Amino acid sequence: MTLTKVEIAENLTRKLELNKTEAKAMVESFFEEIRATLADGHNVKLSGFGNFELRDKASRPGRNPKTGENIPVSARRVVVFRPGQKLRARVEKSKPKG
């Protein structure tokens, strides 16, 4: 199962007794704050959950898998998520389904 933003908003509606519009706005606002902070070049640290960090990747040689031709892969900035200790511990305790 994958949790979506809509499902998060529905859970907030139920747990916090918000109306659907307020819950959806809260979820959108939360993620927009993360997006804006990363776009401004800053990392995001969510205590007890994890960190969203920006990393600069250097340009490197690449290869077209269909033709085998060498092509350059340009330098770029990527977002990396590093789970926090509490999140890792909780996930490790959960039982795999199957």
Swiss-Prot record:
CDD domains: IHF_A
Highest taxon of source: Bacteria
Region of interest: Disordered: 54-74
Any one annotated GO CC term: cytosol
Pfam family, one: Bac_DNA_binding
GO biological process: DNA recombination; positive regulation of metabolic process; regulation of DNA-templated transcription; regulation of translation
Record note on quaternary structure: Heterodimer of an alpha and a beta chain.
Task of the protein: This protein is one of the two subunits of integration host factor, a specific DNA-binding protein that functions in genetic recombination as well as in transcriptional and translational control.
Protein's UniProt name: Integration host factor subunit alpha
Source species of the chain: Actinobacillus succinogenes (strain ATCC 55618 / DSM 22257 / CCUG 43843 / 130Z)
